[in-house]
Amino acid sequence: MPLTLERIAQAIADHEPAHYELHANTKQAAVAVILKQCDDHTEALFILRASHEGDPWSGHMAFPGGHRDPGDKQLRQTAERETLEEIGLDLGRDGRFLGEIDAVHANPRGRNLDLVVTPFVYLLENVEAKFTPNDEVADVLWGSLNDMYSGDSITVGEFKIRGERHRYSGYAVGGQVVWGLTYRMLDHFFGMLDPDWEPHDAF
């Protein structure tokens, strides 16, 4: 069954998102999963993070987003603020909010980090919107959700972590590999759309 926007919107509306228990030291972050319809398939927007010393997600493919600021009354506000800052896209003007999906606990390799990331899903209604990436973003790319869901874009990525090379399953998008935290978010997303869906493994 194809991943149409109608199917995605209905699944999100019917879904009760899972949350993690927050402790005193738990940090919160939010990302925007931005979708657009392209003829016979649905695409999602990804950013390639610029390389910065000390950033555990430096150089990774990700959804736009970041840490919750004290001034953010809601986590959804965090996702929208960070998207505007990172790629210049005003989701309140150019997008339509579809809903919240399951939160994911971040565990970057080799780091002890209590961080919970909540994804919020949007439809990009203004397909002519221009992106103006800031210095945290090296590129903005669109990837086919249908190819990820079906496993057609599954691949193996090789990454250097603390001086050692590791290989992980991921999705190929625009010459890059979506892996790690964002890969896990997508697996949660596909599992929400289809309870019988099983994660793909490139090995």
Task: Describe the residue ranges of each PLM region.
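Acidic, glycine-rich loop-and-strand cores that form catalytic or ligand-binding grooves
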Residues: 130-147
